[in-house]
């Protein structure tokens, strides 16, 4: 059978599947789905997304409303684009909308069966969630790791200082990635995995970057489940390769720790997150294996590192484009910390303007423009609309953060908008949702909070900056690229000048 015949057969099968699965046909004409653009046969509204779904979906939501239907392939999606409706989904009816959609790539190595973000809400998920919230990422545990994280901040400072002496152009995103990865790794297992002075190509770096790229690739299997077994784009195979390598690396780390505990039990204990996971694993009631620990480390590692580094790159970009805002942030740091000192986690409560800057970065540049999609396990009703079982629910953070009824001049970067209110990003204010809300909210907020303040503070407290040669503020590319997180399409590069 030639390729054209294969395409015809697949299209006919997909069309039949599409017609059979259409909820409006299954439920009859009385089923009132949310409004949305008319879907084409088979492909639905896929071609209306373009390469910037955050912008195209937000534009569609302005036309069709805060509860909108989109058909992507054979999958019905409902997009939530207002704070009020987000509260309905994430808080009031979160028990109905708590199941997560699992992308095909994340089923590699059965990762979804262990991963806290994808586990169904049940006893195991509750135990893991409690472990994260009350033990691993609790303030006392994080306070205990301050000193080793501060060493990573000092490494960043020394790299920037050396670059300032030689006039070296710094790739801000790359420097932020190295530091955020190290801040995460020392918190997890007391080990530094990246170094500023090493070659660009290392096994760990290649694996980490490969995994984030694989996880962010659009996959037709997620839109057309009927072709999922064939993995026609190789997305799952690529994910399996990099995820497998990362699991092998974590396997070595776990086994080395266990060996140390057997030979030198007194000195082997680091009181880091790996120790906590091993303690949890020893209690048979918790139903966790050593293999599960490796998968948990993957979630924590990827979630914390990539989100923090991309947010920092956006933050430094906005500060360099707004010298008045940068000057205010630097003045606050000088008054609170003093000159020739590094920002420390203990300084965070005394930096209200920095807090406003970070909130505004979250608002204007949410690295997760859509929260991880939910999947309905039963037919339900929302805002008077019928939502059938199997529907994916997207919370459109990008649109909510640009709601003109809440945010005057929503496209402008204005940290001052947060100085006279108590709006926060920890899940209680549905106008600002960088980490989500409710029972499925990201558990890593306490660690990310500390990482962002200390890293952004280090970039700007002791250094002034100028753009790389040939680049002026007017030429800075502010386009975003869509992937596992939303990142700058063109990396920010600048030269540090010791202040």
UniProtKB/Swiss-Prot annotation:
Gene giving rise to this polypeptide: CYP76BK1
Alphabetical list of Pfam families matching this protein: p450
UniProt note on tissues of expression: Mostly expressed in trichomes of leaves and fruits.
GO molecular function, one term: heme binding
SUPFAM superfamilies: Cytochrome P450
Membrane topology designation: Single-pass membrane protein
Keyword hit for NAD: no
Domain of life: Eukaryota
Location relative to the cell: Plastid, Chloroplast membrane
PROSITE patterns assigned: CYTOCHROME_P450
UniProt-annotated binding residues for heme: 442
Organism per entry: Vitex agnus-castus (Chaste tree)
GO biological process, any: terpenoid biosynthetic process
CDD domains documented for this protein: CYP76-like
Catalytic activity, reaction form: peregrinol + reduced [NADPH--hemoprotein reductase] + O2 = labd-13Z-ene-9,15,16-triol + oxidized [NADPH--hemoprotein reductase] + H2O + H(+)
GO CC entries: chloroplast membrane
General function of this protein: Involved in the biosynthesis of labdane-type diterpenoid including cleroda-dienols, and peregrinol lactones and furan derivatives, dopaminergic diterpenoids that can bind to dopamine receptors in the human pituitary gland, have probably ability to lower prolactin levels, and are used to treat menstrual cycle disorders (e.g. premenstrual syndrome and mastodynia). Cytochrome P450 catalyzing the hydroxylation of peregrinol to form labd-13Z-ene-9,15,16-triol.
Record-listed E.C. numbers: 1.14.-.-
TM regions (residue ranges): 1-21
Name this protein carries in UniProt: Labd-13Z-ene-9,15,16-triol synthase, chloroplastic
